[in-house]
Amino acid sequence: MSIYNVIANIAFLILEDCHMKQIGIGEAFRANFLGHAPNWYKTIILAFLVLNPILMFTVGKYVTGWVLIIEFIFTLAMALKCYPLPAGGLLAIEAVVIGLTNPHSVYHEVELNLPVILLLMFMVAGIYFMKEGLVYLFTKILTKVRSKVALAFLFSIMGAVLSAFLDALTVTAVIIAVAYGFYNIFHKFASSEKVYDTYDINHDHIIDEKYHEDLNQFRGFLRNLMMHGAVGTALGGATTLVGEPQNLLIASIMKWDFADFFLNSAPVSIPVLIVGVLTAIALEVTKFWGYGYQLPESVRKVIEDDVNAKDAAMDTRGRVRLIIMAVCGVILIFSLALHLAEVGIIGLMIIILLTAFNGVIEEGRIGHAFEEALPFTALLVVFFSIVAVIHDQHLFTPIIQWVLQLEGQDQLVAFFAANGVLSVVSDNVFVATVYMSETQKAFEAGGIALEHYNKLAVAINMGTNTPSVATPNGQAAFLFLLTSALAPLIRLSYMEMVKLALPYTIVMSITGVLATMYLL
């Protein structure tokens, strides 16, 4: 039988099966398209795909480019309805097809951001193998510290300190792992489904009625801690050259080492850090704007019992595993602080050390470490294709040219504000790249004095790091949190993140502007 006949028979059987089940091809296609996403969402995505080519040939590439950015932001905002990769990816493919960008530009953006991709592939996976130790550490903190205000302070300050020596994305991955561990412990306890082979953490119908209110309170508690920790990573990440990917870029252009970067940024970064931590405390004291959720006693007891049981069951091999994790943690901080290699390569080293010395040698067990990060890595590459559109169509050029025309402190504040606004809607690595390259050109042309050039670099650094906490779009760590397996469990949607980040955004941005104006 020929290949043609085989294909024809398969097609006939499929069509016959559809006919027997009274499902038309069109209806089956609609059902399969974006899966279980709501019909209104599917309709909107199809409308976007139809609209873009029409706009391309009627109003031109510039307007269509801005419309595409808005459409892509919509897919991010609806992350809990449909993971942004399929829908956002369709928009990105169409952008290439209709000529808003090209495959070479997309590849170039990916090439420029290879350190970020390596970080996602290997550093996040490396943290997976440290999860046991990190959950143990943070669980001890949670069970020993009963004050929510103190917990908010600790999560914020620990996120800041860790991200100053690691990077914000890695620290966010740590906090996600910890929160997921907390949630899993109580959700499994509260489940009426005690056959754990059929237990599903994503469903609440198996939760005993008496625990429903405690579970909702616990979700609010974790949402609060996640936001305190995530904002903390942005606060600390702005202070050092390893904290954020764009910091490395700025430091390399300015020829700053670790100490130079910290000292130059300190007049703005330290006041913002202090005010950010104080904001966390104030939000919990006042129970304002969605904060103030407390840890229910039933949850605390379950977690304490789990900790005590695990402590009692831990043998010598278990303790040695924790020691190995602690040693690898020190190696990780030391390697990143001195920037001995690219972050992702250091992450691969950590994977090798932890798997070798803790006996994780099965491919299946190692593979689980990459499940969390790789979908987001693919999404980030799609995001870079949108960045390629921004670059190719010069969407930000008018704003950049206007800012460069200003002088003195006005220019510093304008740099901070323009970087901040653009970082809210775009990737802050891209924004920093564009502004630093344009500023470098102006400096090399003799249009900027060296002292002012240093200040402009700080304004770009703080502008891309501070207001960008407003939405998940600007900070890769925030987007990683939004699209993580934890977010739907604790009901942390796009708009909920925007809402919870708003007090931080306002206070930190005002502090950043004032520090840039009077202290820089």
Indicate where each model-derived feature is located.
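Residue-level signature of transmembrane alpha-helical entry/exit and packing/kink sites
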Residues: 45, 116, 148-152, 224, ...
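Membrane-interfacial helix-loop connectors
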Residues: 73-113, 159-202, 207-227, 245-267, ...
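Transmembrane alpha-helical segments of multi-pass membrane transport proteins and ion-pumping complexes
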Residues: 120, 124-132, 136, 148-151, ...
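Membrane interface segments of multi-pass transport proteins and intramembrane proteases
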Residues: 139-148, 367, 403-406
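Hydrophobic transmembrane alpha-helices of multi-pass small-molecule transporters
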Residues: 1-125, 264-401, 499-520
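Interfacial loop-to-transmembrane junctions
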Residues: 484-507
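Flexible loop linkers connecting adjacent transmembrane helices
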Residues: 28-29, 105, 132-146, 186-213, ...
